[in-house]
Amino acid sequence: MSYRRLGLRSDHRRSVLRNSVTSLLKEEKISTTETRAKEIKRLTEKMITLGKRGDLHARRQAAAYIMSDEVVQKLFSDIAARYEERNGGYTRLVKTGYRKGDGAPMVMIELVE
């Protein structure tokens, strides 16, 4: 399987990941479980690569996935310019401990400066 199931139905998984990628690009740092963060990282790297391409088709592909027009604008203007010289590795995972309720490993996923 080329993706993580995350214990969710396919439509719910897609929605959770789209929201998380949008939040990460907007806030530049979010806290989530380790498994979700690894999947968010994979998708965010793809979105930033689209932003670096910068053509109309890439913008439309990103807009189809990202849930906010303001975030798409930020991706193509600010974030893509920041990573112009970097080939991949745009995000970092920092382990922050375990969630109190169920002991799930938590991480902070953030954009590399």
Swiss-Prot record:
GO terms for molecular function: structural constituent of ribosome. PROSITE patterns: RIBOSOMAL_L17 (PS01167). The keyword Ribosomal protein applies. Keywords: Ribonucleoprotein, Ribosomal protein. One of its GO terms (cellular component) is cytosolic large ribosomal subunit. The keyword Lyase does not apply. GO terms for biological process: translation. It comes from the Bacteria. InterPro entries: Ribosomal_bL17, Ribosomal_bL17_CS, Ribosomal_bL17_sf. Part of the 50S ribosomal subunit. Contacts protein L32. This is Large ribosomal subunit protein bL17. It comes from Syntrophomonas wolfei subsp. wolfei (strain DSM 2245B / Goettingen). The gene is rplQ.
